[in-house]
Amino acid sequence: MANVLINGMGVLGRRLFRMIWDNELSKSLATDLTVTMINDMIITDLEQMAYLLQYDTVYGRWEGHDVSADVVNKALIVDNKTIKVYSEANVAELSLTEAPVSIDCTGRVTDKILDGYIIAGSHVAIGVANTAGTHGCVVYGINKAVNNRTYTPYGNVIALAQILDIINEGYGVSFALTDEITAYTNNNTLEDSAYLSATKKYQVGRAGAWNIIPVSNNAPKLAGFIVPTLNGKVNGSTRNVGVIAGAVMDCFIQTVHLVESEDAIKAAVKAWVYDHTDWQMEYAEAGYISSDMIGLPRTCFDANTCVRKMNDNFIRVSVIYDPITVAAANAALVGAYTLATP
């Protein structure tokens, strides 16, 4: 059992906490994990942190668990176990010798911050962000961490990397253009309001629940970096829409080799799923939509709707997923695997 520090108890950090605590990934983890420490510079009110962990609009009540705040001793008490809570801006100043895995869910992680976790005593530092930095970016089952500090991406990169890996293995990819439709986030607003943007993309400040809003995203390029041989061959766009969770990733691909049929693509996906364990991607023929994926740690390819062949070398492949849960699962799996790997 390896102790974990979670830095950042926002939506992603709280989802990761619940998943680790409930052993949702226990069958896939190389090393069992347990949360023993939290660091958060934003939620400094421990009673509010406990409340937000217990009640979640998307994922529901955390049934069967008792969560409270020990304000005097600066800790959360979860099922009678103590989780120390810190509010340290410089993670290198933390004492992490008893937390071999640190997972940064702040969305503001950098190479220097990842290095800080190792300086503080952790053996493995994972930063959830759509970047590669100098430490690389890992999607479990597609590429591997090269050292004990690495980034893991959000769900959109994971979903896209899976599509690209499947098609590249079977048919080769000349280029790919992506179109992601995803739920609004905390970057969006309830009402039209001013949005500070150096690039003057003021549309991000429009009401998130009422609009289809294009947003900047480097996910396509990052996914192309993660899948070998595809760096520079992938580009695309992302739009936030008025749903609270869930996403679909459409990928339009020009293949190198001839695609025999849609059934051939379905067979390739099914074979990939079989080889990569069922948590990474689900192959289905059930007519799933995005809300059916909420809370699941895997993406889903539904054969009824997720593939179209336009011509012999041009196809569309889609996956649906819960971006937050998929990102949390990948971070935990990469952390556990890296810790267990000599």
Label each residue range with its predicted role.
Residues 12, 134-203:
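Rossmann-like dinucleotide-binding core of oxidoreductases
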Residues 296-330, 334-340:
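Short, charged interaction patches at domain edges and termini
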